[in-house]
Amino acid sequence: MTAVRAARVVVVGAGVVGLLTALECALAGHRVTVLDRGTIPDPGSSSYDQHRAIRTLVPGDPEGTRRMVAAHRRWRELETVLGTAFYRRVGVVTAWPPDRVAAVVASAAEAGVEVTRLDPAGLPHLGFPAGATGVRETRAGVLLARRVLRAAARWLAAHPAVVLRPHCAVTAVDPRSGRVELAGGEVLSADLVLVAAGPWGRELVGRPVVLHRQTMLYLRPPDRLARWWRTAPAAGGLGADGRAWAVPPGGGTLLKISSDAVCREVAAADCADEDQAPWAERLALAGVLPDVGRYTVVAARACHYTTDAETGGAQLARLGPAVWARAACGGTGFASAPLVAGRIVDAVTEVAA
Ligand SMILES: Cc1cc2nc3c(=O)[nH]c(=O)nc-3n(C[C@H](O)[C@H](O)[C@H](O)COP(=O)(O)OP(=O)(O)OC[C@H]3O[C@@H](n4cnc5c(N)ncnc54)[C@H](O)[C@@H]3O)c2cc1C
């Protein structure tokens, strides 16, 4: 058996991908430096939200489903590693047109993912498209995202092989040499570099991506519905056009709704000057919550993600012998973070062998 030495790893970006990768590398015996231009965690990162949904079924994609089952398993274990409860396994319901349901259920059965059909009348406070059928995935639910980030940052700060460097903006990463340049002129080198700078990564990684901005609305349910929402699942395929989703409140969070209909392509991941009110209004009228007028609107916020310009997906790419990047961060970018972390640990282990 080949002995593995402790390698030096530099992670650029302390969102969920950077933090989990640092954690897994430290657990594997490597030395890790995490750089972020903001605090760690950074409230401006795209991971820093109340919650993110996790599900395992990728209809029609058994390999993708197998990977998400592995990610789900790792999230459960991470609750123990980090000593923090952050997963609300409330299930995820997706609304499907009747002619698609049989294929989705068959796809789940083939992949060994447990689902049940559901009459939308059983979830009267969620707005389903006319005629839709619900499919409920039980091995799914809500990750309390901020809680994950804070727990991971605490764990890393206490680990002797990890150095956290907040307020360190990276200005360039050379894919061939692996040199990492910081604002101020400092240069770092490592056996492996991961660029996990979220929507801002495109400034460091020269790969074509499409930048998207999406507005989310945070609401407090009326008192009389608080009990109902306590056990409600996350849900997708909602609203009159079937493009909206809802993440239920719980664990100290608010109800959140959004829709692909308010997702737009933008040129820059900075929306400080953009008025969110018109987008919030569209969301409120999307039919996600049948009695939306009874809910208290607490906030509207925009968040960014990127998709690969060719495939439309998120992507982990090897840019050079020792440089990797989460080149695009869209879709299931939070839930799938353990998969990126696992792949990087494998790559570091190869380098260190
Ligand atoms: C509206 C919306 C809803 C979503 N819902 C879900 C969901 O339900 N489930 C799911 O799985 N995913 C979801 N996602 C996707 C998910 O949130 C992201 O894919 C994921 O959080 C990205 O994490 P990250 O670590 O790659 O990037 P980020 O969390 O954005 O972290 C990047 C970090 O890099 C730092 N940084 C940037 N540039 C530099 C630099 N030059 N130098 C140093 N540091 C730098 C930033 O400060 C930041 O802290 C959603 C995304 C959006 C926008």
Locate the predicted segments by residue.
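Glycine-rich FAD pyrophosphate-binding loop
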Residues: L27-S47
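Conserved beta-strand-loop-beta-strand element in the redox core of flavoprotein oxidoreductases
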Residues: T171-V187
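Active-site substrate-recognition segment that forms the wall
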Residues: L23-L27, A85-Y87, P199-P321
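Short hydrophobic core segments
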Residues: V10-V12, L35, V187-W200, A341
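Flavin (FAD/FMN) cofactor-binding and adjacent substrate-gating region
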Residues: A95-P166, A172-D174, T307-A309
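Glycine-rich phosphate/pyrophosphate-binding beta-alpha loops
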Residues: V323-A337
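Dinucleotide-binding Rossmann-like beta1-alpha1 core, especially the glycine-rich loop
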Residues: Q50-L126, G131, R243-A244
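N-terminal Rossmann-like FAD-binding beta1-loop-alpha1 element of flavoenzymes
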Residues: R8-V34
